[in-house]
Amino acid sequence: MNGKIIKGIGGFYYIKTDQGLIECKARGKFRHKDIKPMVGDDVTIKMEHGKGVIEEIHERKSELVRPTVANVSLAFVVFAVKNPDINFDLLNKFLILCEYNNIEVIVCLNKIDLVSEEEREEIKKRINVIGYEVLFINAKKGIGIERLEEKIRGNITVFCGPSGAGKSTLINKLSNKEHMETGNVSVKLGRGKHTTRHSELIEVADGYIVDTPGFSTLEIKDLMDKNSLKYCFPEFTQYNDKCKYRGCLHYKEPNCALKEAVESEKINRYRYEFYVRALEEIIEEEKNKW
């Protein structure tokens, strides 16, 4: 019998099948091979003495670490436009994580009533220019929900973003229930409390959504090596093979096509500077390993 893991708690996995939801444990062989079932996994299960057992985990199309979710095909990166202000460094980190895992990204900007139309367009332009679609939403008022449902259809969609951006409120709207506790934003800090207890797939609009377990502490240097980073910036693609030196990191090498594009304002300088900072962190991390 085949199904999909929609929830995992304490070694038990809840599999959605044609025969309903079945609670399962994983075969010991997975533990011996250091393989752990993940929410989002497509699996084959078997009933033994009235209890479900996971026999096979099908090949994963993608795999996230934070949150621990498999087969995600779309990511909504949720940020508030105000309260708190957008942290573009953190936004870049989320974008890189998604790119590294080959997951399509849509940036969702919440609390749109807190800024003017002019400010919204300026933010949208800044994100569009690096290759990402932007949707404006108001999670509390339900503005933009239908657009999100259109995108969710046929996908496993993950929501990521900082605490206080409105992810839990948004998921409550989409799932039509108080699926998770929603932390109030601290007036002093302007940040939400860590409230999400675990990852779980929720069926919405002929697709699935999964929330991150609160806010993730992302470290790019732990995700990839120095040669992989440049491929996580879509706007760099057309320049990666045009440099004088093969394997150019777009860092200190001469005759670099990307650096020339930055100087001629074809590439956003802020994004390039962020790339350099991230690259230097990776290089330093690699030095420390040896």
Swiss-Prot record:
Its cofactor is Zn(2+). Zn(2+) binds at residues 243, 248, 250, 256. GO terms for molecular function: GTP binding; GTPase activity; metal ion binding; rRNA binding. Keywords: Cytoplasm, GTP-binding, Hydrolase, Metal-binding, Nucleotide-binding, Ribosome biogenesis, RNA-binding, rRNA-binding, Zinc. Coiled coil: none annotated. GTP binds at residues 110-113, 161-169. Binds 1 zinc ion per subunit. InterPro entries: G_CP_dom (IPR030378), NA-bd_OB-fold (IPR012340), P-loop_NTPase (IPR027417), Ribosome_biogen_GTPase_RsgA (IPR004881), RsgA_GTPase_dom (IPR010914), RsgA_N (IPR031944). GO terms for biological process: ribosomal small subunit biogenesis. It comes from the Bacteria. It is an enzyme of class 3 (hydrolase). The keyword Zinc applies. Its EC number is 3.6.1.-. It is found in: Cytoplasm. Residues 61-218 form the CP-type G domain. Belongs to the TRAFAC class YlqF/YawG GTPase family. RsgA subfamily. One of several proteins that assist in the late maturation steps of the functional core of the 30S ribosomal subunit. Helps release RbfA from mature subunits. May play a role in the assembly of ribosomal proteins into the subunit. Circularly permuted GTPase that catalyzes slow GTP hydrolysis, GTPase activity is stimulated by the 30S ribosomal subunit. Monomer. Associates with 30S ribosomal subunit, binds 16S rRNA. This is Small ribosomal subunit biogenesis GTPase RsgA.
